[in-house]
């Protein structure tokens, strides 16, 4: 979803930072953004997306500058072309990368060290449905991948194919312990 009007931007801030059930207040918004890294990152991310959708070189330049600032301060690289619906949550805004050809549905939770994207720029977009909860250290890489609605993705999962609705996805990891070989063993 593209943020094209200031009213839409304000509605996103209201939903994601203040909570939809609470009355909107600029003072509360400013206070929460100042005190919480997740809210601060969301505030500036949404502002950069809004500026990116506006016509003109000045607003595009401002959007790019804000986006670079998020990358420097938090390590969050959510490209300006990514389409992200309401309800994004960045619990620990550190080392999160989302490429421009990604569409994320409503109420998505991205945790630290998550990468969502494709190898080539011309690939089909990756689509995440509504209510997707992504664990820490996950990679979703490929072309035309669709993650369904109400999906939970376990920590350290690697996804390169579609995931259906209403499932929990984990990547099995087998641990093997081998004794070290010394020169005496050889």
What is each PLM-predicted segment?
Residues 74, 80, 85-86, 91-100, ...:
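Left-handed beta-helix
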């Amino acid at each position: 979803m593209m943020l094209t009007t200031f009213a839409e931007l304000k509605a996103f801030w209201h939903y994601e930072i203040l909570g939809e059930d609470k009355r909107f207040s600029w003072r509360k918004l400013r206070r929460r953004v100042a005190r919480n890294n997740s809210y601060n990152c969301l505030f500036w991310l949404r502002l950069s997306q809004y500026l990116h959708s506006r016509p003109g070189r000045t607003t595009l330049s401002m959007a790019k500058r804000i986006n670079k600032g998020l990358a420097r301060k938090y390590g969050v690289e959510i490209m300006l072309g990514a389409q992200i619906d309401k309800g994004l949550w960045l619990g620990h805004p550190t080392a999160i990368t989302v490429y421009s050809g990604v569409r994320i549905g409503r109420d998505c939770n991205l945790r630290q060290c998550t990468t969502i994207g494709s190898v080539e720029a011309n690939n089909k977009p990756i689509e995440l449905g509504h209510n997707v909860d992504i664990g820490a250290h996950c990679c979703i890489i490929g072309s035309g991948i669709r993650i369904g609605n109400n999906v939970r993705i376990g920590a350290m999962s690697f996804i390169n194919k579609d995931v259906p609705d209403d499932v929990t996805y984990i990547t099995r990891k087998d641990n093997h312990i081998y004794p070290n070989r010394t020169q005496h063993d050889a």
